Amino acid sequence: KIVKNEAGAMWLKDPDKIYSIINKVQSVLDIPLTVKMRTGWADPSLAVENALAAEAAGVSALAMHGRTREQMYTGHADLETLHKVAQALTKIPFIANGDIRTVQEAKQRIEEVGADAVMIGRAAMGNPYLFNQINHYFETGEILPDLTFEDKMKIAYEHLKRLINLKGEKI
């Protein structure tokens, strides 16, 4: 529906459209505007130009998924393109997204890609503890061990108890 109406990911084909839409939205907001986009529609050839259009239009930060719209979730995140975008943006933070499943991959996006931050997507569904592991690493330099099954069960049980307290139901 969205693409058929020439919106959403379709704008990845037109940096001027990206600028225009973001500029209009930003002009009526009293809060920071952040944008997430993919590296492109079918190829990443406009990734830097699209990112610079968003920056020029006034976004406060830009997140980019390292795959094109055509790729969806196949293949691997294009780290070279993410690096080019990170280098091109000079006024706003750049947030790398895609294929970040471990502390080491988060570290790579910061150090090698040059991202200011990372965004975790699908990996969090299978490992919601990843956020804590990444935060702990960047605060201390220490990589925490993976949680044991027993630890995960304790956390799940505590979460269940809190839900029951909130909803007033019994186990």
Q: Where are these predicted regions, by residue range?
A:
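A generic short-segment signal for beta-strand/edge and adjacent turn/coil regions
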Residues: 3, 63-65, 88
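Glycine-rich tight-turn/loop motif centered on a GG-T
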Residues: 1-18, 67-79, 140-145
